[in-house]
């Protein structure tokens, strides 16, 4: 089942859409989401003045932004962990559409959104990251999976305070 169809998935989607809505109103952009009825390798398009200016992947976490780190479960993390395949897929789509790829992370507990410009319009990865195999939660619904994950320094994000 698609994560967006479960209670946890619906809650996360609502939270990230609300957070990105604040950024839209402040900066005159629109996040156009792909259909939730199927799996996609990125979440949608960023448009400005009816022109596509980026592709994006959006996440929402029950975490906060503190001292330049993500605070989750009482622990400060200087990096954001994401499946490496998400970065690779986003860069491919950036190249295909000739626009940058952004990773947007809503930190629900503090009212911040991290925006990483992951690749340029040619699909060239712009962020530094460490890649290693690690076991993490498989989906918003739980389960565990060992896979290649990328650890991106929080210092590479543009931080939006959306409170």
Language model features with spans:
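Mg2+/Mn2+-dependent nuclease catalytic core
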Residues: 61-89
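Conserved catalytic cores of phosphodiester-cleaving nucleases, focusing on short active-site segments
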Residues: 44-68
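Alpha-helix C-cap/termination motif
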Residues: 23-26, 47-49, 93-97
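Active-site metal-binding core of divalent-cation-utilizing nuclease and nuclease-like domains
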Residues: 28-53
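Acidic-basic catalytic patches of nuclease active cores, encompassing PD-(D/E)XK
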Residues: 1-36
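Acidic, metal/cofactor-coordinating or nucleic-acid-engaging core segments within structured domains
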Residues: 84-104, 113-120
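Non-catalytic C-terminal interaction segments of nucleic acid-processing enzymes
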Residues: 4-7, 22, 47, 106-163
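Acidic carboxylate-rich catalytic motifs and surrounding loops in phosphoryl-/glycosyl-chemistry enzymes
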Residues: 33-39, 102-110
């Amino acid at each position: 089942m698609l994560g967006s169809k479960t209670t946890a998935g619906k809650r996360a989607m609502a939270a990230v859409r609300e957070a990105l809505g604040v950024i839209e109103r402040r900066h005159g952009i629109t996040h156009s989401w792909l259909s939730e009825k199927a799996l996609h390798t990125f979440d949608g398009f960023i448009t400005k003045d009816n022109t596509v200016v980026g592709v994006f992947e959006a996440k929402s976490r029950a975490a906060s932004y503190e001292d330049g780190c993500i605070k989750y479960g009482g622990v400060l993390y200087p990096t954001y962990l994401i499946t490496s395949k998400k970065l690779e897929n986003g860069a491919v789509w950036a190249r295909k559409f000739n626009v940058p790829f952004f990773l947007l992370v809503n930190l629900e507990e503090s009212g911040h959104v991290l925006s990483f410009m992951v690749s340029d319009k040619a699909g060239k990865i712009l962020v530094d990251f460490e890649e290693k195999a690690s076991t993490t939660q498989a989906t918003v619904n739980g389960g565990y999976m060992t896979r290649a994950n990328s650890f991106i320094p929080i210092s590479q994000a543009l931080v939006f305070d959306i409170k």
